[in-house]
Amino acid sequence: MFETEKEVERVILVAVDDGTNEFDAESCLDELEDLANTADAVVVGRMIQKLGAINRATYLGSGKIDELKAFAEMKDATGIICDDELSPVQIRNLENALNLKVMSRTLVILDIFAKRAMSAEGKVQVELAQLRYNLSHLTGRGKEMSRLGGGIGTRGPGEKKLEVDRRRIADRISDLNKNLKEIERHRSLLRENRNNQTPVIALVGYTNAGKSTLLNALTGAGVLAEDKLFATLDTTTRAVETQSGANYLFTDT
């Protein structure tokens, strides 16, 4: 993966309330704001549109797009983050209408992953996810992304480079898959060398639920624990011996 020089992204959060989501739009945007902050963006506003159905071409209605464009100019925004997953056509049409970079929740999460991954396996997995995401969202976006600059989504493989040579992307994905299989094979060998009788306990929970904090309290592992979404991306396993002499392996998933 490659990282660009850090830029401060000023973003507006956008959601469509079509009545199908079990969570209300404001709650979804609250979490999206946490994600944006974790990705080092500055949230300067939010906007929700109630629609019977999401517009397949532009995500938002034409009137709301005009309102959003004026709001973005007033707030000096540099980008828009939509709570929903957008199609390549929706992204292209919104970027053309707003003259701003348009991002989805998925792109923000992948950007956070690119920043947080520390292990070789984690970095390979994140780059694979970025390449696959970008490959599926290339349609007509090379020019727009080049014009709209860096920020969120520019950690990892760049859009302009991806647009130039799809075959190289496929080759890179193939190479990364081979690397990942080799890493997994090495990990399997390490597992076989461990005492197979030792119980393994996995700490499972939503992001920022406190898994790393609990692992540190139980084992003294010293794993990074912050009040941020996806603060820990890589898996950590530590051995613990109880007062009775029993041994356990705790894994921060």
Name each model-derived stretch.
Residues 108-129:
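Short alpha-helix plus adjacent loop in nuclease-associated cores
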Residues 125, 129-147:
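Interdomain "pre-motor" coupling segment immediately N-terminal to P-loop NTPase/helicase cores
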Residues 19-24, 54-58, 116-121, 160-161, ...:
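Flexible beta-alpha connector loops of hexameric P-loop NTPases
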Residues 1-111:
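N-terminal accessory targeting/assembly segments
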Residues 4-11, 141-253:
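Conserved G1/Walker A P-loop phosphate-binding module
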Residues 32, 131, 169:
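A residue-level signal for conserved active-site and pocket-lining positions in enzyme catalytic cores
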